[in-house]
Amino acid sequence: MDEWIRQAVKYANGAIWNNGSWGVRNMRGSETSLSVHATGRAVDLSYRKTEQHPTANRKGAVAFLNIVIANANALGVECVLDYFPQKFGRGYRCDRQAWKSYSKPEIHGAPGGDWHHYEITPAMADSPTLVKQAFQRVFAEIPQ
C-alpha cells in the first residue's frame, strides 16, 4: 500500500496527500466491522490545503481520481469513496464498475469531506513492483 500511496501522490502533482492509511480500527460508525484500513489496503488521500500541503486542491484530486477510475482494473482499485458531494457522498466499486450517489447516510464524513478513500486489491497492496509498473503504464499515456 505504501508504494500505491507514493505513486498516487506523485502523479497527482501535489493535489493530494496521505491523510491516513494503515490502522487497526472499526469502520467509522460501526462497532463490529473492521475497516479496510485494518488490512493495509486502504488510504484516505486528502485535498485539503494546509501549510504543509499548499498545492492541495479538489480540482486536481478529482482529475487524478477520474484517471484512476478509468484505469481501476490496471491500478488494482476495488473501491473509491468521495465524501464531498451533497447529500450523502458517492462510491465507486469494482463489482459494478460505476459510481453510485448515496441517497441516505452510508459513509461517515459525507457530505463535505475533503478526502477520497481508496481501497486496492491484496496483490497490489503486497507488490511495490506491480504498483510502480501499473502507474507508469497508466500515466505514461497522459501528458503531465
Residue spans for each PLM region:
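Secreted/periplasmic proteins that engage bacterial cell-wall peptidoglycan
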Residues: 1-106, 113-121
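Glycine-rich loops and low-complexity Gly/Arg-rich segments
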Residues: 105-109, 143-144
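Low-complexity, Gly/Ser/Thr/Pro-rich intrinsically disordered linker/tail segments
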Residues: 121-144
